[in-house]
């Protein structure tokens, strides 16, 4: 994880000092904490320069450069799904905009009378693909089934509900926080769904 960052696609000159360190810590924390709820591809957080040796054959060794220690994670290799999944639990941003105009949230009808930033009953999972020009397209249920297959899609839907609810409970108890919107990337291995990339890191 590097210190590079951007806002709405515009790079921040010089990045954010130590951002990569905190991104690695956040990801490793939530990957380890939620692995019982939903399996993910996380294997280890490399905090010391010799931590990679545990993955090498006997007699082999590798010394990680000091500037990379605390910024690297080891992941299980899985096949990524060509879609970004987003969980929306509260009426903010584009979710509120669509609801205030149509009564829907990403095409899903909602009860009337909800207020801005209010909890969405049940929360919503949506998926997007991004083309070469950076344009995003929301996938329909039929397109999702074509991408993942029906069994894997059901596993993903079940996983996001368990994961989102577990994280919400943990944050309410420990920090009085809520998660209004969460991006998830899924992959698969032997027809089983795994959380990939990051969990609860600020993008």
Where are these regions (language model features)?
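Active-site loop/lid in soluble adenylation, ligation, and acyl-transfer enzymes
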Residues: 1-130
């Amino acid at each position: 994880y590097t210190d590079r960052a951007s806002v709405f696609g515009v790079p921040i000159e010089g990045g954010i000092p130590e951002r990569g360190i905190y991104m690695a810590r956040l990801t490793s924390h939530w990957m380890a904490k939620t692995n019982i709820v939903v399996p993910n591809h996380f294997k280890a957080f490399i905090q010391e320069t010799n931590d990679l040796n545990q993955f090498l054959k006997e007699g082999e060794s590798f010394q990680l450069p000091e500037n990379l220690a605390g910024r690297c994670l080891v992941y299980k290799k899985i096949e990524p799904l060509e879609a970004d999944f987003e969980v929306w639990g509260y009426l903010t941003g584009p979710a509120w905009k669509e609801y205030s105009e149509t009564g829907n949230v990403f095409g899903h009808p909602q009860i009337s009378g909800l207020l801005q930033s209010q909890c969405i009953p049940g929360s919503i999972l949506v998926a997007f693909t991004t083309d070469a020009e950076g344009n995003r397209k929301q996938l329909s249920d039929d397109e999702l089934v074509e991408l993942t297959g029906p069994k894997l899609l059901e596993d993903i839907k079940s996983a996001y509900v368990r994961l989102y609810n577990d994280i919400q409970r943990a944050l309410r108890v420990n920090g009085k926080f809520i998660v209004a919107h969460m991006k998830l990337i899924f992959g698969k291995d032997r027809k089983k769904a795994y959380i990939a990339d990051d969990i609860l890191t600020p993008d």
